[in-house]
Amino acid sequence: MKVNPPLAWHPAPVSAPVDLHWWLTHRGSLTRLIQDRCEHFRVEPIFQALATACIDELEVMNLRRQTRALVREVYLRCNETPVVFAHSIVRKEHLRGAWRGLSRLGNQSLGTMLFTNPLIQRTPLAFKKLKPHHPLFERACKRLQNRPADLWARRSLFILQHQPILVTEVFLPAIRRL
């Protein structure tokens, strides 16, 4: 199944604002970058349940349309301001395998876990400018006072024991002030 062009993610953040480009393309831990720029960093869990994937996640996660997977969504907060909306998805059967601890993370950072395990491999980043019709745009903006016209996001797979988790990070307007 091919993803339709409007749903496509791109290998480079072409046309991304200059002040976001560095954030988007940094391959290290986004959690660590934000922590280094904040007095108080916090992970705020907002959703975690078995749910269906977004349509543009199906192919990359090798999921059928109605298959349920574990979806985890959090805000990364800097001094209580949300700066990133993070969305991760892992196949249900992998919760008994490589990703068995994921469902118990609570307000702990997934990024810390991903970047401290040397066995985890990461695929290249993919980028997209999310518009209001994209489901992740809607969820990312749920607690924002002012909705922007669009939001930039990046995603990649983290693979442990041949089992992937897809992590998407949506950059909220406040990230530009860090």
From Swiss-Prot:
Alphabetical GO CC annotations of the entry are: cytosol
Binding of substrate, residues: 72, 110, 169
Tell me where on the tree of life, at the top rank, the source sits. Answer: Bacteria
Where does the UniProt annotation locate this protein? Cytoplasm
Report the InterPro entries cross-referenced here: Chorismate--pyruvate_lyase, Chorismate_lyase_/UTRA_dom_sf
The UniProt keyword set, sorted, is: Cytoplasm, Lyase, Pyruvate, Ubiquinone biosynthesis
Q: Please verify whether the record's keywords include Oxidoreductase.
A: no
Q: One biological-process term from Gene Ontology?
A: pyruvate biosynthetic process
Q: Does the keyword Oxidoreductase apply?
A: no
The GO terms describing molecular function are: chorismate lyase activity
Catalysis: reaction(s): chorismate = 4-hydroxybenzoate + pyruvate
| EC number(s) from the headed UniProt entry | 4.1.3.40
Q: In which pathway does it act?
A: Cofactor biosynthesis; ubiquinone biosynthesis
Family affiliation: Belongs to the UbiC family.
Which HAMAP family does the protein's record reference? Answer: UbiC
Function text: Removes the pyruvyl group from chorismate, with concomitant aromatization of the ring, to provide 4-hydroxybenzoate (4HB) for the ubiquinone pathway.
- Name this polypeptide is given: Probable chorismate pyruvate-lyase
